[in-house]
């Protein structure tokens, strides 16, 4: 059964035709009422994926199909009409930049409804109040304030209210909690979960923070240098990662992994750096401690279980190498990778 959103073979590049793609052959599916997380380091292509999915960035190749209609090829009037429909909504990453500083909260939330052009003033006002109430904001108290006169957590919720005012079927939220304190972060995450359970809304959450997704996402896609290296049910991916890069991300998130260790960005290169470029071979080859000759060919995402894929030539051998290193003479990987893979193997054997 096809999903509400189907992304296939999506490639995006900026500048020259021979420029390295920002997204390279991305595959992603989102079903009705599902929360899907997209995780990865800064620069992995997460925001470009979100912006391409909603029609803000044209792809070089591939397809984006929403509710059975291909939208990646829409241009001009057809694209503007689709955006105005509000069925696919995007909550931008930075509220301060996304919200017009001269528009009050009420006017900011009303703007996409006014642009749609099919509602009267009375219904627009009612929809604005409904959206603000849904995100836990008092329209009577905050509606006439400017963005600069409310807190960061309130601005983030105004951005979400604006995104859901059109009653979309799918919301793409780009780093919705990255700049919030713990209290506001949890409030926004509960809101996203409630939109799914109460409205049947599908949600894509773009994040570099794994702990933000651990409690609410159904599935997760791991993006590295524009390619999806692993994808599957969130508990399975976080509990037993099948790609070395995923294991490093999890090891760097104490609240998810239960441990510590340096972040993925601190991973040193492999002992023998590959002679090929990331474009030719595995995108993770220049950092992977398990790189071998076959990694010269870029691995395609392959099924590794129900609903799971991993783009690695050495699944599951790299995990076996980690388990056998007791202690390693020549380390098969950095300590945090050994810890992450070793602990999850022990858990799997219980």
Question: Residue spans of the language-model regions?
Answer:
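Helix-to-loop junction immediately C-terminal to a conserved catalytic motif
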Residues: 54
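Conserved ABC transporter NBD signature motif
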Residues: 62-73
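ABC ATPase NBD coupling module
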Residues: 71-89, 107, 115, 121, ...
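Conserved ABC ATPase signature
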Residues: 146-150, 154
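Conserved catalytic motifs of ABC-family nucleotide-binding domains
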Residues: 167
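P-loop NTP-binding/switch modules centered on Walker-like glycine-rich loops
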Residues: 180-262
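Charged, flexible cofactor/metal-binding loops and thiol motifs
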Residues: 233-339
